C-alpha cells in the first residue's frame, strides 16, 4: 500500500512540475527578433501614437509571427502581430469609432497590423488592466492578456476586476509569473512571458 502511495505521489509531482516547466522546449529568439526588428520604424511610430513601448511591440511580433507579415494561424490570426479580425480587430475598430472589422488584406499590411496591434495593447492597458502599478507586472499582464484574454487572467485572481487588480498590485514580477504558471488555464500563458524575456534580451 505504501509503495502504491509513493508511486502515486511521484506521478503527481511529475505532473505538477511539467505544468510549470514553461521554458521547455527552449526558444531561441535571435532570428525571430532580427526579422521583427526590420519593422521597428513602424513599431516606433505606432508606439508613439498609442503610448506603447516599441520594444514590447517588436517582441510580440517576434513571438507571434517571427516577423512574417503574411502569417496566418489555424485560428485565423493574421499578420505580424497575429490579430483576429472578429475579436481584437473589431475592438480596435470600435475604439476608432468605426463599424465592422478589418479585412485580411488590411491585417497583412505591416503598417496597419502594427498600428492595430499597438491600439489593442492600449485598449488592454487603459481598460481591463487599468490600475496595475508595477511596469514589469503590467508588461507581463499585457502579453498574457494579448494572447489569452484579459478576463481569463483577471479571473485567476478574482471575479471582481477591482479586487483582481488589487491582488496583482501585491505581487512583484516574479510572483506574478509564478501565479500565472500555477493558476492560468492556458499552458502557453507563462511560456509567453518566458518568450517575452528572451525576445527583449535578444534586442
From Swiss-Prot:
By its UniProt entry, which InterPro entries does this protein fall under? EmtA, Lysozyme-like_dom_sf, Transglyc_AS, Transglycosylase_SLT_dom_1
Lipid-acceptor residues (S-diacylglycerol cysteine): 16
Q: What membrane topology is given?
A: Lipid-anchor
Q: Where does this polypeptide localize? A: Cell outer membrane
Q: Which Enzyme Commission number(s) are listed?
A: 4.2.2.n2
According to the UniProt record, one GO cellular component term is: cell outer membrane
Listed HAMAP family: EmtA
Supply one GO BP term: cell wall organization
Q: Which reaction does it catalyse?
A: Endolytic cleavage of the (1->4)-beta-glycosidic linkage between N-acetylmuramic acid (MurNAc) and N-acetylglucosamine (GlcNAc) residues in peptidoglycan with concomitant formation of a 1,6-anhydrobond in the MurNAc residue
Point out the signal peptide segment.
Answer: 1-15
Q: What species does this protein belong to? A: Shigella dysenteriae serotype 1 (strain Sd197)
Protein name per Swiss-Prot or TrEMBL: Endo-type membrane-bound lytic murein transglycosylase A
NCBIfam families noted in UniProt: PRK15470.1
Q: Where does the record place the N-palmitoyl cysteine lipid attachment?
A: 16
The record's function comment reads: Murein-degrading enzyme. May play a role in recycling of muropeptides during cell elongation and/or cell division. Preferentially cleaves at a distance of more than two disaccharide units from the ends of the glycan chain.
Please report which protein family the annotation says this sequence is part of.
Answer: Belongs to the transglycosylase Slt family.
Q: Does the keyword Magnesium apply?
A: no
Pfam families annotated for this entry?
SLT
Q: What is its main location?
A: membrane
Amino acid at each position: 500500500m505504501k509503495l502504491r502511495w509513493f508511486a502515486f505521489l511521484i506521478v503527481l509531482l511529475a505532473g505538477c512540475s511539467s505544468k510549470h516547466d514553461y521554458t521547455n522546449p527552449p526558444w531561441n529568439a535571435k532570428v525571430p527578433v532580427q526579422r521583427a526588428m526590420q519593422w521597428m520604424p513602424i513599431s516606433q511610430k505606432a508606439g508613439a501614437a498609442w503610448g506603447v513601448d516599441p520594444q514590447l511591440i517588436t517582441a510580440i511580433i517576434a513571438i507571434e509571427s517571427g516577423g512574417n507579415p503574411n502569417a496566418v494561424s489555424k485560428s485565423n490570426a493574421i499578420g505580424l502581430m497575429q490579430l483576429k479580425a472578429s475579436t481584437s480587430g473589431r475592438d480596435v475598430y470600435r475604439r476608432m469609432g468605426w463599424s465592422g472589422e478589418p479585412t485580411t488584406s488590411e491585417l497583412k499590411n505591416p503598417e496597419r497590423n502594427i498600428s492595430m496591434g499597438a491600439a489593442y495593447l492600449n485598449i488592454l492597458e487603459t481598460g481591463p488592466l487599468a490600475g496595475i502599478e508595477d511596469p514589469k507586472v503590467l508588461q507581463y499582464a499585457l502579453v498574457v492578456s494579448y494572447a489569452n484574454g484579459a478576463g481569463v487572467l483577471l479571473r485567476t485572481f478574482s471575479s471582481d476586476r477591482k479586487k483582481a487588480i488589487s491582488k496583482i498590485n501585491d505581487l512583484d514580477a516574479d510572483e506574478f509569473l509564478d501565479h500565472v504558471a500555477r493558476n492560468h488555464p492556458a499552458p502557453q500563458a507563462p511560456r509567453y512571458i518566458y518568450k517575452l524575456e528572451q525576445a527583449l534580451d535578444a534586442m
